[in-house]
């Protein structure tokens, strides 16, 4: 019998007993190293997390709601359960059923849909924070997201607290058709409820914020903050270029360009957002607060190598 037929190889003959068993069980995470889209450097994941998911080149990575809550609130916070809605009312199917895509997104993110709500304090002042999760079907706005937005607004009204929204979305969810488009006026009315109650509504625009989200609640804030480099617009730049058949200006639809044109009030590094929000809340709520969060200074990563290298 040959070595091939009985599954043996020359390597197995020289490997010490038990060694192959040890290595076969070794599990290496897929995201141990993360590539920076700007510098193309590889950044060690733990260093990226310690640096608030901002790369050494200054690129602000997209982050999950749990991290966003952790970075934003003074300390402890309480997540609020999001409302349940009818699943797949249109029985939509393209390459696969909508229900299958929902199940995959839920498994990937551990969330029921694209929005998460939490309450806590920022600078000692009570606040309701709503975060869109781009990892859940591109953060798209559907019935569940619309209901979550309204619940966050109602929570703010009940607590007489300001509402802060971190946007990150590709637009309305096409699998829900007109039902998703209906969420645009519904969320707009929720913002108006806050305004009538005299409660601040602050929007933090993160990468990307586009489509129906931009055309509704994302641009209705009393104050608009944007993270550096965030793509903000209705249609994407490639779609616009193909439509008008012209090259767009450098940095078109990026946070800094919109700041220059007066579309956003301030571009703020992620580390400075909690302190910035605290100052704004004190002014808008006309309250002194009890504490002032310090800027979250990201440590300089030690484990950064060129693309393809190893540490």
Curated annotation (Swiss-Prot):
Entry keywords, A to Z: ATP-binding, Cytoplasm, Fatty acid biosynthesis, Fatty acid metabolism, Lipid biosynthesis, Lipid metabolism, Nucleotide-binding, Transferase
NCBIfam families: accD (TIGR00515)
Tagged with keyword Mitochondrion: no
Location in the cell: Cytoplasm
GO CC terms, sorted: acetate CoA-transferase complex
Species per Swiss-Prot/TrEMBL record: Maricaulis maris (strain MCS10)
Protein name listed in UniProt: Acetyl-coenzyme A carboxylase carboxyl transferase subunit beta
InterPro entries (alphabetical): AcCoA_carboxyl_beta (IPR034733), Acetyl_CoA_COase_Trfase_b_su (IPR000438), ClpP/crotonase-like_dom_sf (IPR029045), COA_CT_N (IPR011762)
Family assignment from sequence similarity: Belongs to the AccD/PCCB family.
């Amino acid at each position: 019998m040959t070595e091939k037929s009985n599954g043996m190889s020359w390597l197995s003959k020289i490997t010490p007993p038990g060694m192959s068993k040890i290595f076969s069980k070794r599990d290496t995470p897929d995201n141990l190293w993360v590539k920076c889209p700007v510098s193309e450097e590889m950044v060690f994941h733990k260093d990226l997390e310690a640096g608030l998911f901002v790369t050494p080149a200054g690129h602000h990575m997209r982050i999950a709601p749990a991290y966003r809550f952790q970075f934003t609130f003074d300390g402890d916070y309480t997540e609020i359960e999001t409302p349940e809605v009818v699943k797949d009312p249109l029985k939509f199917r393209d390459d696969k059923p909508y229900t299958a895509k929902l199940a995959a997104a839920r498994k990937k993110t551990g969330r029921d849909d694209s929005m998460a709500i939490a309450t806590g304090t920022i600078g000692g002042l009570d606040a309701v924070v709503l975060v869109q999760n781009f990892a859940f079907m591109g953060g798209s706005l559907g019935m569940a997201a619309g209901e979550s937005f309204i619940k966050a607004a109602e929570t703010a009204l009940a607590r007489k607290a300001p509402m802060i929204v971190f946007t990150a979305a590709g637009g309305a969810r096409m699998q829900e058709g007109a039902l998703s488009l209906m969420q645009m006026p519904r969320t707009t009315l929720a913002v108006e409820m806050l305004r009538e109650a005299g409660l601040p509504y602050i929007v933090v625009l993160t990468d990307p914020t586009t489509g129906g989200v931009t055309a509704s609640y994302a641009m209705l804030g009393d104050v608009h903050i944007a993270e550096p480099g965030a793509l903000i617009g209705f249609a994407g730049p490639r779609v616009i270029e193909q439509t008008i058949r012209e090259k767009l200006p450098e940095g078109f639809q990026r946070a800094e360009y919109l700041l220059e044109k007066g579309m956003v009030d301030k571009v703020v590094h992620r580390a400075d957002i909690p302190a910035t929000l605290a100052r704004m809340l004190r002014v808008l709520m006309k309250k002194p607060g009890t504490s002032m969060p310090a800027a979250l200074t990201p440590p300089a990563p030690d484990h950064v190598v060129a693309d393809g290298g190893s540490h």
